[in-house]
Every structure is written in C-alpha cells, then in structure tokens.
Regions:
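Terminal catalytic/cofactor-binding subdomain
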Residues: 1-36, 42, 174
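Glycine-rich, histidine-containing beta strand-loop boundary motifs that form or position
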Residues: 2-6, 52, 76
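Short loop/turn segments at secondary-structure transitions that flank enzyme active sites
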Residues: 6-8, 54, 71
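Catalytic cofactor-binding cores of redox enzymes
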Residues: 14, 31, 52, 92-93
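Short, well-ordered alpha-helical packing segments
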Residues: 22-29, 49, 62-73
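C-terminal accessory/tail domains of diverse enzymes
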Residues: 39, 56, 60, 67, ...
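Glycine-rich, often proline-containing surface loops adjacent to acidic residues and nearby aromatics
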Residues: 40-51
C-alpha cells in the first residue's frame, strides 16, 4: 500500500482544505519550495514521539534519531508511484520534502542540540502568518523575533501571546 504520497490523484484534483490558514499557505508556500503544495496536499506520514527525561537525554535521543532518519526513510519507503506511474523514486514523499522549504534543521544541531539552540532557531524562522481579529494575515520576510520586538506592521505592532508562538511552531516542519 502506498501511504507516503497519494499514488493516484493529480494535485489539481485534490480539494483545498477550507481552513483559512491553508488559503494563506497555498498562496505563499510555493515561493519557498517547488513541491510545497504537494507536501501540503499529497503527502502523509507516521510520527514517532520519543519521551525524554532531561535536556541531556533529549540531546542524545535527538542525535540518534537524526542519524537513524535515512534508515527509517529507506525502511518505510512506500511511495514510488505518482499519478499512477513510477515516480523514479522509492520514496517520492522524501523527494517532496527535500523540495519544501519550511523546515529542516541546520547541520550544527546534529552534533550539539539543546533547547536554547532550538528556541533560537524557531525565533529566527520566517513566519507564514499571524492570526489576529479572527483572520490569518500573511507575513513575509519577518521572523517571530521581529514579532516579539513589535516589528510587524501588518498587525499594528501588537506583541505576541503564547497562542501566537504555538501557531508559529506549528508551521516549522523539522
């Protein structure tokens, strides 16, 4: 069973998600990666949650999982078909994610990851949007750090709340 990438449907045949955030993402994400819309609408995956007991334990488990990722991709490669034809990849899903510019971690994290580095990384990631007054506002070329410093003119320089950070973190795909 092909489960990592829709093996049959063309992108144009997939209905758009009616949520307003997806309207903004559908418009803006292709600027950051040629296959961003395929990632949004035609991929799926299995997640693994790993508990940790301390920052040191987290760092060790993060490093191990990073090194194991290529093996996991190979073991679970099940998306060789795209639009009823061979895609030329055992994991077309992996190819799509390599052409989506909303995530991945700098290679420095692979050796020496800690909470502070991830927080700095997250605060420096460009934002996709802000949710304010029951509306998603597209934000381009601004980081969450800019938002924290009141430098987002699109929302009258309001300062972020915890819910804004949660929303931003939900748009960083690592």
């Amino acid at each position: 069973i092909s489960a990592g990438f829709d093996p049959i449907s063309k992108l144009s045949e997939i209905p758009n998600n009616p949520k307003q955030r997806y309207e903004v993402m559908t418009k803006d994400m292709p600027e950051g990666g040629a296959l961003s819309l395929d990632m949004m609408y035609r991929t799926c995956g299995t997640q693994l949650n790993i508990d940790y007991t301390s920052e040191e334990d987290f760092s060790k488990k993060f490093k191990l999982s990073t090194y194991l990722t290529p093996i996991f991709i190979a073991i679970f490669s099940n998306s060789a078909i795209k639009e009823n034809l061979s895609s030329g990849y055992l994991s077309y899903r992996a190819h799509v994610w390599q052409n989506t510019n909303r995530g991945g971690l700098p290679s420095i994290f692979f050796e020496d990851m800690d909470f502070e580095k991830y927080a700095d990384f997250s605060m420096s990631m460009p934002m996709l949007f802000i949710f304010n007054q029951n509306k998603h506002f597209s934000i381009k070329n601004k980081t969450f750090k800019d938002f924290m410093n009141g430098q987002i003119e699109e929302v009258n320089n309001i300062l972020p709340e915890e819910k804004d950070l949660e929303l931003h973190l939900s748009t960083i795909f690592t």
